[in-house]
Regions:
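Acidic, Ser/Thr/Pro-rich intrinsically disordered transcriptional activation regions
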Residues: 9-24
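Short, small-residue-biased leader/transition segments that mark boundaries at the very start
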Residues: 3-5
């Protein structure tokens, strides 16, 4: 069914790139579609699945970026935004596939060489540094000026929002290379933290693609769970959140008729009776929801990791707790302080 609707529904592309890949691997969701039995977490045999992220990135992101790149001299701030979006998209690709064509993608040569991930990441840092420098200078010179406000469905032209997102993205990438190149990781993390505009800190800084005022829109997870009817929440995240009696469960999941939260175990072969069960919870979402790119809670957790490695343990604990508080407040959930203070609860049964 899904292979027939990929071109019709953007959500189907999202499904094979995100929901049937990272979400399942992490235990956030689990498959209930019985026709997926030959194509699950342990046996991804369909090329339309494992090629999807690669193809989508180059045909949708890189092709658009290549049209903007020649305008860098005339519209440096606009291309800086494009550079940030490119890195945000492509770091997922290299983390999935390893070496990718990247260093010479604007050369016009159709036979691009595959660059080692180390070189790709260093280019990411160079591009983010240049984009952040360009936008910071623009913001400091014209603090109230919007950039592409009529077209920006992420930050509505708010330049400081893009800078905070780029700084936080830089910090994320820095912490990802810490085991490969600790010196580079520390250098890039410090640069992200030290930028005068700063990192994402609260709900106002959320990086998410908003539903446009006009035109068609669909929220992929809603389509996957309520229209395609292909997945439910994962047993892994459910076990942790049930065990910790996490007050955010109702924000993330829809309770069953019994008022409980139950998820799908990773890698199972679903049967018809299992797929039709009313005892499995769905993701709590609507078709009008925004598509999340990055949360401010992640920024606090990354800052905590930085402090744990190169700063003080007390600051690490402070930032980690602030990450939890920010997650709660962003979702509109209460009970963060009790959740942080608890030292007795453990993950539930899987």
């Amino acid at each position: 069914r899904q292979m027939c609707i990929r071109d019709r529904y953007g959500s189907a592309n999202y499904q094979v790139i995100e929901d049937l890949a990272g979400n399942i691997f992490a235990g956030y969701t689990g498959v209930i579609n019985t026709s997926f039995t030959g194509n699950n977490l342990y046996n991804v045999t369909g090329k339309d699945w494992y090629n999807a992220m690669f193809n989508d990135a180059y045909t949708r992101v890189i092709s658009a970026w290549n049209q903007l790149d020649p305008q860098r001299g005339e519209f440096p701030e606009v291309v800086a935004l494009a550079d940030i979006v490119k890195v945000a998209a492509m770091h997922r690709v290299t983390d999935t596939y390893g070496p990718i064509p990247y260093l010479n993608i604007s050369s016009g040569d159709i036979n691009k060489a595959y660059d080692p991930q180390q070189a790709v990441y260093k280019r990411f840092f160079e591009e983010l540094d240049a984009a952040i420098t360009t936008l910071t200078a623009f913001y400091e010179a014209q603090p109230g000026t919007k950039l592409l406000e009529a077209y920006d469905n992420v930050f509505s032209g708010n330049v400081s929002g893009w800078i905070k997102f780029a700084n936080t993205l830089r910090l994320r990438l820095a912490m990802r290379v810490v085991y490969a190149d600790a010196a580079l990781a520390q250098e890039q993390a410090a640069a992200a933290i030290g930028n005068p505009v700063g990192l994402m800190t609260g709900a106002a800084d959320l990086a998410e693609l908003h539903k446009p005022a006009t035109g068609s829109w669909e929220y992929p997870l809603y389509m996957i769970q309520y229209n395609f009817d292909d997945s439910r929440i994962g047993a892994t995240i459910e076990a942790y959140m049930n065990g910790y009696q996490d007050p955010r469960r109702g924000k993330y999941f829809v309770a069953t008729a019994k008022g409980e939260y139950h998820g799908v175990r990773t890698g199972i072969t679903p049967t018809s009776s299992y797929a039709d069960s009313e005892d499995l919870s769905r993701v709590n979402c609507t078709n009008n929801d925004n598509i999340m790119w990055m949360t401010p809670a992640e920024a606090w957790f990354l800052r905590a990791e930085y402090e744990l490695r190169w700063g003080s343990e007390s600051d690490a604990a402070t930032y980690y707790a602030e990450g939890i508080r920010t997650s709660f407040s962003t979702l509109g959930a209460s009970g963060a302080e009790a959740y942080i203070a608890d030292k007795e609860l453990t993950p539930g049964s899987y």
